[in-house]
């Protein structure tokens, strides 16, 4: 399967390194806003083709799957371009800036009979099944609460600090905390409350409380100006689970009701962690599927809708590029 990368920034580098270490997929083409930038990227990371415009790459019939690596403010516009050009799409999180854009893309993909999926890597990683299996075993009893945080000192990064790039902590890192809670507690959400500290028009530190059916709750924090331990805790009636780094789990530890460690699990070695979403796309395409089981379209729309509601409660409106 030949991969085309749309955009040549930092996250594109990670995907290029990932694909270079995989079997049955190929770093084939990269497109940037200038040919010189694309050519330099292609030479450094071993791509066969470099294009100085997105349209040129999308016209290449050899491209099987496009990975969108641009700021999420432009995901809708770029994903739409890909679909209209007949390309399958793996779009970096946050998938779009709102649920309405996500619905439009999924409808277009269905019309074009193409695969499109959100590249939120934690949904595809082996650690997800490891956590599910621990919970299913009953060792921690009935799960009633989740606490998670994800904060990075990235407030000066352009995509974070600029409202016109859909900046702020929520869409960039908060999406991981909401997905972490959702993977554990499900989709039967009753209420969401959130507060934030804003700087220059974007949210820099957010706290989110989510209440689910069955009297279960998630308490989440995300931020773009401080460092946190990135921990996730899953609390049950007989014990609890601690996940070291919810953004790329490094260790999963199980404790009993006496706070004694009873088991610890290490996720398998990986290239970067991005390989799992690429593998999921390859499987789905080979099987004629139009979405990945790991991140169904309905779930992307649901999570985007949660974030829409949070921003609405803050009065934060994001410019749309459509």
What are these regions (language model features)?
Residues 65-67, 213, 280-322:
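C-terminal helix-rich "cap/oligomerization" subdomain common to oxidoreductases
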Residues 265-279, 295:
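Active-site loop of classical SDR/Rossmann-like NAD(P)-dependent oxidoreductases
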Residues 122-193, 198:
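Predominantly a Rossmann-like dinucleotide-binding segment in NAD(P)-dependent oxidoreductases
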Residues 179-251, 268, 280-287, 321:
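Contiguous beta-strand/loop segments that form the cofactor/metal-binding neighborhood of enzyme cores
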Residues 51, 91, 116-118, 243:
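Hydrophobic residues in well-ordered beta-strands that form the structural core
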């Amino acid at each position: 399967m030949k991969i085309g990368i749309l955009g040549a920034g930092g996250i594109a580098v990670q995907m290029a390194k990932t694909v270079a270490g995989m079997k049955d997929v190929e770093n084939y083409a990269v497109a940037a806003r200038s040919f010189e930038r694309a050519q330099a990227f292609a030479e450094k990371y071993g791509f066969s083709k470099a294009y100085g415009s997105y349209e040129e790459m999308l016209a290449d019939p050899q491209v099987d799957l496009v990975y969108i690596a641009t700021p999420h403010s432009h995901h809708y516009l770029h994903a739409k371009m890909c679909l209209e050009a007949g390309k399958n799409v793996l779009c970096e999180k946050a998938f779009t800036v709102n649920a309405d854009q996500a619905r439009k893309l999924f409808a277009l993909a269905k019309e074009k009979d193409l695969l499109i999926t959100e590249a939120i890597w934690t949904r595809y990683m082996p650690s997800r099944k490891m956590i599910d299996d621990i919970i299913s075993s009953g060792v921690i009893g009935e799960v009633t609460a989740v606490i998670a945080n994800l904060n990075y000192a990235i407030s000066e990064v352009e995509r974070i600090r600029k409202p016109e790039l859909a900046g702020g902590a929520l869409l960039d890192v908060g999406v991981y905390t909401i997905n972490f809670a959702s993977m554990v507690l499900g989709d039967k959400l009753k209420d969401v409350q959130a507060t934030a500290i804003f700087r220059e028009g974007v949210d820099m530190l957010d706290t989110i409380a989510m209440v689910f059916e069955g009297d279960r709750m998630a308490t989440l924090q995300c931020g773009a100006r401080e460092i946190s331990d990135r921990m996730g805790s899953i609390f049950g009636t007989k014990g609890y689970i601690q996940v070291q780094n919810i953004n790329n789990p490094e260790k999963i530890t199980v404790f009993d009701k006496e706070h004694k460690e009873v088991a610890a699990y290490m996720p398998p070695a990986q290239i970067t962690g991005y390989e799992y979403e690429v593998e999921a796309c390859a499987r789905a395409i080979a099987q004629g599927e139009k979405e990945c089981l790991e991140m169904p379209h309905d779930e992307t729309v649901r999570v985007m809708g949660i974030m829409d509601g949070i921003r609405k409660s803050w009065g934060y409106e994001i410019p749309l590029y459509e």
